[in-house]
């Protein structure tokens, strides 16, 4: 569960990332493909557009932490769509690792242990929500 302190830490530190959003997204994908080159073929389209979509999704998620009842259905839909792209449960851990690394690079000294824990918690909740929604799509296919 995400505490109010964690929610506020994520929102305040994300505000510091917004001015460098394109660079942060570029760093994220560079790191993702560095630690998991097998994921590169999943991204066939324009990476400029992909970076923009990543930051739009992160912005919506961070803002949505104030309105979880509205955020959860959006995140579930995202999880179902990602299942169709071939995303597997194990990929979420890799994405989380790349995200935390990117935040550390972007925030520098502001990326404290508490900030890291807050982001890891929020990402964990979002990733679990996406994985559960993806299973709802995949399970009927496997039966």
What are the roles of these predicted feature ranges?
Residues 1-143:
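Globin-like tetrapyrrole-binding proteins
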């Amino acid at each position: 569960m995400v505490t109010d302190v964690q929610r506020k830490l994520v929102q305040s530190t994300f505000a510091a990332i917004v001015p460098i959003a394109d660079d942060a997204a570029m760093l994220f994908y560079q790191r993702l493909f560095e630690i998991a080159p097998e994921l590169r073929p999943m991204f066939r389209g324009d990476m400029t557009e992909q970076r923009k979509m990543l930051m739009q999704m992160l912005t919506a998620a961070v803002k949505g932490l104030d309105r979880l009842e509205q955020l959860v259905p959006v995140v579930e839909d995202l999880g179902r769509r990602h299942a169709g792209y071939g995303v597997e449960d194990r990929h979420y851990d890799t994405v989380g690792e790349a995200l935390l690394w990117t935040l550390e690079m972007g925030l520098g000294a502001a990326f404290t242990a508490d900030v890291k824990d807050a982001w890891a918690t929020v990402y964990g909740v979002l990733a679990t929500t996406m994985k559960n929604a993806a299973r709802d799509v995949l399970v009927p296919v496997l039966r």
